[in-house]
Amino acid sequence: MAGQPEPDFVVVGTGAGGLVGAIAARLNGLNPIIIEKAPVWGGTSALSGGGVWIPNNPLMKRDGVEDSLEAGLAYLDATIGDVGPASSHERRLAYLQEGPEMVAQLAEQGFGWRRAPRYPDYYPDYPGGRVGRTLEGVNFDAKRLGPWLNTMRRSAMPDMALSTDAAPQIPTAFRSMKSFATLLSVMGRTIAFRLKGQVPLALGKTLVAQLMVIVQKLGIPVRLNTPLHSLVEENGRITAVVVKTARGEERISAARGVLLCAGGFAKDAAYRLPLQGVTGEWSPASPDDTGDAHKIGVAVGAQLALMDAATWFPVSIMPDGVINAGIWERTLPGSIIVDPAGHRFVNEAASYVDVGQAMLNRGPCWLVFDSRYRNRYFFGSTPPRMTKALVDNGFFVTASTLPELAAKCGIDADGLVQTVARVNDMASRGVDEDFQRGNNVYDLYYGDPTHKPNAAFGGLEQTPFFATRVYPGDLSTKGGLMADEHARVLREDGSVIDGLYAAGNCAAPVMGRTYPGAGATLGPAMVFAWIAARHCAGVTA
């Protein structure tokens, strides 16, 4: 750190929240430093879809889309309800007030935003619900990271010039000219990047990459392989951190404050099991997501809240062991999810949080579909009809009759036969009378618009039939350190721990146990990190 001023604001974590917190700190006169325990940066944010849910954002205004703070607040009140002070009126209001300003100021620093204009809120019929509140980063050339590209956390997904609103059209690319044109457009943009010697980043990777470029432009030091060991408290205030290094423990000054943005505890099985009844084995979160900030915060008296909450998500385990957090596989017509009794129990096209939560008490279930479904749609990245390899490696179970399929899967045969008969009867009328699948615009977003009369709900009639296991996974845990509307961490008695802030999945969620829209994890992580840094610098809303 030769030549660098002594840091006065320590940010823990290099996900989107931590990077934004450091940027806000520098823009408001602080001397931040970012520490990251892993040898790579980006956290779970880099592995995510990269959506940022910001009601009443500047891009909506630019596009002439009506929204307001009041509509956003009405929607949060309707979807979240009363879950205690983690989602107080003051915290909801702070999020809605500061989010649009954060978006605008990051754009001034060079961040390229775009809107997903077709993406609905997850409960679009609730008061204040809207379409198009989700933002994302534009496709970005990874080579602009310079040497930081070598240490960026990467997923197994290939680098493509994808966009959020293009994703729902990929699985139906061979069903409509519009969807096929979208696929060709994605491929064309990807090739254009490559022909210019560039590497296209999308989704979570463009989000963290663009933020890291701003961090480097502002001269903010980032230290990898530097796990937080403890917080130093002097006279009731956090004034420094102790980190672990190859040379032993080291103290880093934080005279103005510390911002914890170190993620959740999805991958600490021993810590998680008594709190949530699951170990995290079905979570695609970062392997470094082990609750360090939670434990270190508690050591200085911090209060925890909503520790049972997670961003639940039905997942499948691919033959190579990769956890696939897919969406369209369960929303396209011709597929259903059943439990071991052969029964449906949820609207499969609903929010992934709702579907995943419904699966929790049932354990692993089965996604069942017919040949027509398999011949029409992509399954993950596997094109239609290309089925043999997935049958040969055991990922798909197949049979010529439903009773035979049930026997192979350990599903109650009578239950499955009765369920499919019921589904086929309802699908012929286009109305899911049991779970209302396809009754709102969110259900239809990942549907097949060429399938009539219901783009998200169809029968299972053509043999052979198929099934694959689906598990109650999650994208991240949500519970964490209780914080107020300024992102200040609170003690059990509600008093403020001076100098300590928290945002993201190590803070108790302003969204409570629900998930209002795409980007309702990254949005609060970034906005409350922004709020924390500005408050620490003496700037208030």
Language model feature labels by segment:
Residues M1-G72, P117, P124-A541:
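Residues forming the flavin
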Residues L69-S88, L93-R133, L183-M187, I336:
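A conserved beta-strand/loop capping segment in the N-terminal third of enzymes
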